[in-house]
Design a protein with these regions (language model features):
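Short, small-residue-biased leader/transition segments that mark boundaries at the very start
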Residues: 3-8
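Catalytic or ion-translocation cores adjacent to nucleophile or general acid/base/metal-coordination motifs
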Residues: 10-46, 205-230, 298-313
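Active-site cores of enzymes that catalyze phosphoryl transfer or operate on phosphate-rich substrates
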Residues: 40-83, 87, 162-174, 182, ...
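Long, charge-rich alpha-helical interaction segments
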Residues: 50, 202-262
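Structured alpha-helical segments in the cores of large, soluble enzyme domains
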Residues: 54-70, 86-104, 127-135, 179-187
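Short, conserved secondary-structure transition motifs
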Residues: 115-122, 146-160
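Flexible, glycine/threonine-enriched loop-and-boundary segments that flank and lead into catalytic domains
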Residues: 165-172, 254-311
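Structured mid-domain segments that build the active-site/substrate or prosthetic-cofactor binding neighborhood
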Residues: 172-207, 218, 229-232
Length: 313
């Protein structure tokens, strides 16, 4: 299919099996399941207008990832994710729905999206079209802002032997870095509490109850910890403050293991910073990080989320 090579380079693991089917004819279980259930997907009505009801398997898959829907080069936020009767919602729309249910304050829902610069106008156009309907449905006003990932955080692509990958013309290839590269974007948001979520980590209306409940619970834990942290920071301003209860709180509640020779300065350093409260799901073999104890250069042990490729074999 025309332009497939270009699209293939930018694929995500979401469509890896589909691209291999188009390029090599390798029909994995994932491809078979998609084709058998294609009429159940949220994008089927749009795909049907392109390929009809009886298109062969190759043409169907080609028109999902390349020609037609071009999902191989479409950001996940703009993929049609869920269908409710005749209503189809893209992933970014589900964030509007979810935000209205736990992130509204004073009738406003503030949502910040970090997107690729080449897709920014598409996000802006879709949200401008959809937001009035959701505001009417939920009785809120949305305040949407955007930022783009800093290109200086892009990572050099490498071959399997860790040598730099080069394009056909000899130029080096840089790819957008992972989620950690967005910490600068997060730091520029003016807010007391920020709920952080992947663009494609959304569920349907029928299953959203647990999401809303636990998001509120995480915020409650954050506020309770924040209240005690502020109290202890004020206590540390008083000469001769008793350090042992503060150190016990840091180790038992914040899960930060202090060195034996800690003092007031270190306790203040640990407490006087942004607070992160994370909800973890059971690891059942899917890709993604997990919680590990990490010892920093200052000798302080903290709980961190780490990917397997960050851990020395």
């Amino acid at each position: 299919s025309r332009g497939l090579g270009d699209v293939y380079k930018r694929q995500t693991r979401m469509f890896k099996d589909l691209f291999e089917f188009v390029r090599e004819g390798r029909r994995t279980a994932v491809v078979g399941e998609l084709l058998a259930n294609r009429r159940r997907f949220a994008f089927w009505p749009e795909l049907r207008t392109i390929v009809g009801d009886d298109a062969d398997e190759l043409r169907t898959v080609e028109n999902i990832v390349a020609e037609g829907l071009r999902y191989g080069e479409t950001p996940k936020g703009l993929v049609s994710f869920h269908r409710y009767g005749d209503e189809v919602r893209k992933a970014v729309e589900e964030h509007l729905v979810e935000g209205a249910q736990y992130a509204a304050a004073g009738g406003e829902v503030k949502i910040h999206f970090t997107v690729s610069p080449e897709h920014l106008t598409r996000f802006e156009a879709l949200l401008a079209e959809k937001i009035p309907g959701y505001e009417s449905r939920f009785g809120v006003k949305y305040r949407i802002s955007f930022s783009v990932q800093d290109p200086s955080t892009d990572t050099l692509a490498v071959n399997p032997d860790c040598t730099p990958f080069r394009r056909a013309d000899g130029r080096l290839l840089f790819r957008p870095a992972g989620h950690g590269a967005l910490i600068g974007n997060l730091g520029k948001i003016d807010a007391d509490i920020v709920f952080v979520k992947n663009i494609d980590n959304v569920t349907t209306d029928a299953r959203r109850g647990d999401t809303v409940l636990y998001k509120k619970a995480l915020a409650g834990v954050l506020l309770a910890l924040q209240e005690r942290i502020f109290e202890y920071l004020m206590a540390l301003e008083v000469p001769g403050a008793e350090l042992e209860p503060i150190a016990a709180f840091i180790e038992n509640e914040l899960c930060v293991k202090l060195p034996k020779d800690y003092g007031t300065a270190l306790l203040r350093q640990v407490l006087d910073r942004p607070i992160r409260v994370c909800g973890m799901v059971r690891n059942e073999g899917e890709p993604g990080g997990g919680p590990f104890w990490v010892t920093g250069a200052d000798g302080v042990e903290t709980l961190q989320l780490a990917e397997s490729n960050q851990i020395a074999p």
